[in-house]
């Protein structure tokens, strides 16, 4: 299913997905394919046959608290879309799997075992002329029972404060302009902060450095070298963050899942939380 050089068998190729389209379109919940985008505009136009569409903005986070879904809401979302806790779920999405990686992380937070990312995401599927449809699938509801939450893959503000005090690795995956404080957020995006800059001691290793031009992940050796160049080799607790937790999910996936560095967490509060805190330490510049 995946490159055997990676620590875990968590990636599937577009070819593998294409060869299992019959299973993904079946009422049997053994296999489910899910496209996760920032919204469902692209999904509504076309998607892989059998793919369920999740809207990251409205379905994958609490609309009041900007937190991850509660266990009950997570169970309702998956069960209502025909996903059971035993389903083999393949996730893919726009922006080289930003939001699919965040959803993968949330699946793991609630203990779903058989979940994978499709390497390359939506753009790879479309650009390489794999089959698409505009038909929205409907599957029999399932009684989904989540586990966890498993807090060992999630970082909170207190964890970040302790990491800063101890000088532990922090990976800021935002653009150099965001990292330096030149801009607060990528152009056109609304979630922002009162201050620009980065968490003291953080290394700026862009999420884009983990993927090839076609959106597929770089090899295990390339990823290992990328992080080792910044002193991150898996021997210390490491926290990844971005602006709202979706781009940092790519770094968490690369470090924790592909390289097998177990002590890696995703700070989903990210800069939108830290940059709005009164009195929190901030560094500017590169």
From Swiss-Prot:
SUPFAM superfamilies named in the record: Rhodanese/Cell cycle control phosphatase
Catalytic activity: thiosulfate + hydrogen cyanide = thiocyanate + sulfite + 2 H(+)
EC number: 2.8.1.1
Keyword field contains Ubl conjugation: yes
Keyword Ubl conjugation appears in the UniProt entry: yes
Glycyl lysine isopeptide (Lys-Gly) (interchain with G-Cter in SAMP2), cross-linked positions: 162, 166
Comment on protein domains: Contains two rhodanese domains with different primary structures but with near identical secondary structure conformations suggesting a common evolutionary origin. Only the C-terminal rhodanese domain contains the catalytic cysteine residue.
Catalytic residue positions: 242 (cysteine persulfide intermediate)
One Pfam family from the record: Rhodanese
Binding site for substrate: 247
InterPro entries referenced in this protein's UniProt entry, alphabetically: Rhodanese-like_dom (IPR001763), Rhodanese-like_dom_sf (IPR036873), Thiosulfate_sulfurtransferase (IPR051126), Thiosulphate_STrfase_CS (IPR001307)
Organism: Haloferax volcanii (strain ATCC 29605 / DSM 3757 / JCM 8879 / NBRC 14742 / NCIMB 2012 / VKM B-1768 / DS2)
PANTHER family linked to this entry: THIOSULFATE SULFURTRANSFERASE
Gene Ontology terms for molecular function: thiosulfate-cyanide sulfurtransferase activity
Membrane-spanning ranges: none
Record's protein name: Putative thiosulfate sulfurtransferase
Entry keyword set: Isopeptide bond, Repeat, Transferase, Ubl conjugation
Domain Rhodanese: 27-134, 164-283
Cited Gene3D superfamilies: Rhodanese-like domain
Highest taxon above the source species: Archaea
Role played: May be a sulfotransferase involved in the formation of thiosulfate.
């Amino acid at each position: 299913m995946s490159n055997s050089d990676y620590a875990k068998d968590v990636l599937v190729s577009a070819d593998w997905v294409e060869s299992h389209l019959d299973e993904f379109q079946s009422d049997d919940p053994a296999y489910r394919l899910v496209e996760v985008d920032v919204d469902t505009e692209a999904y509504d136009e076309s998607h892989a046959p059998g793919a369920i569409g999740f809207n990251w903005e409205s379905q994958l986070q609490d609309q009041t608290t900007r937190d991850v879904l509660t266990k009950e809401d997570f169970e309702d979302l998956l069960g209502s879309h025909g996903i059971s806790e035993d389903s083999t779920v393949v996730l893919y999405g726009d922006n080289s799997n930003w939001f699919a990686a965040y959803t993968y992380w949330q699946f793991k937070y609630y203990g779903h075992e058989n979940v994978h990312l499709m390497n390359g995401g939506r753009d790879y599927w479309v650009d390489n002329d794999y089959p698409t449809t505009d038909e929205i699938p409907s599957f029999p509801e399932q009684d989904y029972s989540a586990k966890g939450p498993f807090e060992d893959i999630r970082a909170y503000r207190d964890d970040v404060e302790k990491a800063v005090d101890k000088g532990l690795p922090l990976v800021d995956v935002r653009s150099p302009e965001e990292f330096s404080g030149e801009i607060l957020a990528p152009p056109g995006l609304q979630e922002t902060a009162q201050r620009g800059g980065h968490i003291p001691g953080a290394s700026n290793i862009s999420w884009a450095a983990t993927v090839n031009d076609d959106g597929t992940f770089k090899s295990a050796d390339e990823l290992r070298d990328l992080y080792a160049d910044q002193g991150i080799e898996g021997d210390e607790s490491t926290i990844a963050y971005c602006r709202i937790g979706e781009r940092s999910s790519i770094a968490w996936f690369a470090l924790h899942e592909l390289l097998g560095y177990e002590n890696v967490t995703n700070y989903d509060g990210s800069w939108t939380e830290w940059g709005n805190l009164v009195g929190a330490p901030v560094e500017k510049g590169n």
